């Protein structure tokens, strides 16, 4: 494995003591991992939810996943050729964007590729993303799944949620015979349109987790050859 370049003084952005200590800790962890593992992969984890992140960490328990401020990760790798910790790492640094995670591992390349190519989890839609489906609440009694399953397999939405449906979600509901009802079908969203906060909350209220979360993997660095290889997994 190639030796690291001579240590240089790297200045991190000025911040409060606690914040600076955290940046220095992450910086040191990255440098230590670079000297420990053969490969480092760049993962893009925008919109990742905590349970999903925990699952990924568990799956790679024998490896090390480091997340931190993009700038801190870039400085640890080296933003420029003359600052890089190891040969050609500055090329990997350029690929850090958004919410970045660095996966350090000795697992072979194909194992890592196949894991992330096949890793897909259902997720609730977020605001400003495209609606995964057209969703209309049927007229009559409002059920907990909003008509996604037969009424005989569902239960009416609890009446205490009626003010939320009417005031927060702006759905024209009312209480009739102790149950939440609407007089006509209510269109929540159309497939492909951009969701606002209200629409995303309604989909979640009705248990619609029709979106998919995939980890984007742009490239990896091989310590043995000092090369960066593009992967473009889920980068479309």
UniProtKB/Swiss-Prot annotation:
One GO cellular component term noted in the UniProt record for this chain: nucleus
* Keywords noted in UniProt: Cytoplasm, Nucleus, Ribosome biogenesis
Q: Name one GO biological process term.
A: nuclear-transcribed mRNA catabolic process
Keyword tRNA processing assigned = no
Q: Which domain of life is it from?
A: Eukaryota
Q: Where in the cell is it found?
A: Nucleus, Nucleolus; Cytoplasm
Q: Impact of mutating residue 68 to D?
A: Bypasses the requirement for phosphatase YVH1 for the release of MRT4
CDD domains, A to Z: Ribosomal_P0_like
Q: Which Pfam families match?
A: Ribosomal_L10 (PF00466), RL10P_insert (PF17777)
Q: Which residues form a coiled coil?
A: none
The UniProt similarity line reads:
Belongs to the universal ribosomal protein uL10 family.
Q: What else is known?
A: Present with 18200 molecules/cell in log phase SD medium.
Task performed by this protein: Component of the ribosome assembly machinery. Nuclear paralog of the ribosomal protein P0, it binds pre-60S subunits at an early stage of assembly in the nucleolus, and is replaced by P0 in cytoplasmic pre-60S subunits and mature 80S ribosomes.
Can you name this protein?
Ribosome assembly factor MRT4
Biological source species = Saccharomyces cerevisiae (strain ATCC 204508 / S288c) (Baker's yeast)
Instruction: Give the source lineage, highest ranks first.
Output: Eukaryota, Fungi, Dikarya, Ascomycota, Saccharomycotina
Q: Which gene encodes it?
A: MRT4
């Amino acid at each position: 494995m190639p030796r690291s370049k001579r240590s240089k003084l790297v200045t991190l952005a000025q911040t409060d003591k606690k914040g600076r200590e955290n940046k220095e800790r992450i910086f040191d962890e990255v440098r230590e991992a670079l000297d420990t593992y053969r490969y480092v992969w760049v993962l893009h984890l925008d919109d990742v939810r905590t349970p999903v992140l925990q699952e990924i960490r568990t799956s790679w328990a024998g490896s090390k996943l480091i997340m931190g401020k993009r700038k801190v990760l870039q400085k640890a790798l080296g933003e420029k050729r003359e600052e890089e910790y190891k040969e050609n790492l500055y090329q990997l640094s350029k690929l850090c964007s958004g919410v970045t995670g660095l996966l350090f591992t000795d697992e072979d390349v194909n194992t890592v590729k196949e894991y992330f190519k096949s890793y897909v989890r259902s997720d609730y839609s977020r605001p400003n993303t495209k609606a995964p489906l057209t969703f209309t609440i049927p007229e009559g009694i409002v059920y907990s799944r909003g008509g996604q399953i037969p009424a005989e397999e569902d239960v009416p939405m609890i009446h205490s949620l009626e003010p939320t449906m009417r005031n927060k979600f702006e759905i024209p509901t009312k209480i009739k015979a102790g149950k939440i009802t609407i007089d006509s079908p209510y269109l929540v969203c159309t497939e492909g349109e951009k969701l606002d906060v209200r629409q995303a909350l309604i989909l979640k209220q009705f248990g619609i987790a029709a979106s998919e979360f995939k980890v984007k993997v742009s490239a990896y660095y091989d310590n043995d050859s000092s090369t960066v290889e593009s992967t473009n997994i889920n980068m479309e």
